[in-house]
Regions:
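Extended hydrophobic leader/signal-anchor segments used for secretion and membrane insertion
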Residues: 1-178
């Protein structure tokens, strides 16, 4: 069992999270920055207004629903206004009055979008294209910035969507091994 766990951990690190391992090798000590947390409904409402004006915003991620691609307390994302939305894009959307989520589009049917977090096994949210505040253009990690349009990242996202039936077990291994 230990050998199997070790092999799976190696495969997960190789295909999904190589930047995390490289960061640990470069910097032995992680520095915790001081942050102030605001309620999502107030903060993301203001961010949505600025994005509607054409500005961009960088926000810290809260929660574990986008794990393993975005980690709570470690990663930030750069949000920007969008021209078009496609399946696979990570977006900030208002799914109910005052309730915002940062999730990935898994299905599009005209103006209706279906969203799901990468770390969610079940449960989806529905919204309209007009409810989307902004789209993620960059993933900012300590020591590295990844563009959302990066081909390697896009392949990993497609692979993760394809592995949806066994996602529960992969997430369990991720939590146990990391």
């Amino acid at each position: 069992m230990k050998a199997l766990k070790r092999v799976i951990r190696m495969l997960l690190h190789t295909f999904l999270w190589p930047w995390r391992k490289a960061y640990r090798r470069r910097n032995g000590v992680a520095v915790q920055e001081e942050r102030h947390e605001l309620p999502n409904d107030a903060f993301l409402g203001l961010v949505g207004e600025k994005l509607a004006e054409g500005h961009t915003a960088v926000i810290w991620v809260k929660g574990y629903s986008m794990r393993p691609f975005i980690e709570f307390g470690r990663d930030r994302v750069k949000l920007a206004p969008f021209d078009e939305l496609k399946v696979g894009d990570a977006v900030v959307a208002q799914i109910a009055p005052g309730h915002y989520v940062l999730h990935r589009i898994i299905q599009r049917d005209g103006e209706r979008l279906t969203l799901q977090g990468d770390g969610n096994v079940r449960g989806v949210e529905h919204c309209l294209c007009g409810d989307v505040c902004g789209v993620v253009t960059e993933y900012i990690r300590p020591g590295r910035t990844l563009l959302a349009s990066d081909k390697r990242l896009q392949r990993r996202i497609r692979l993760w969507r394809w592995l949806r039936p066994i996602r529960r077990y992969l997430l369990w291994l991720y939590r146990e091994c990391i």
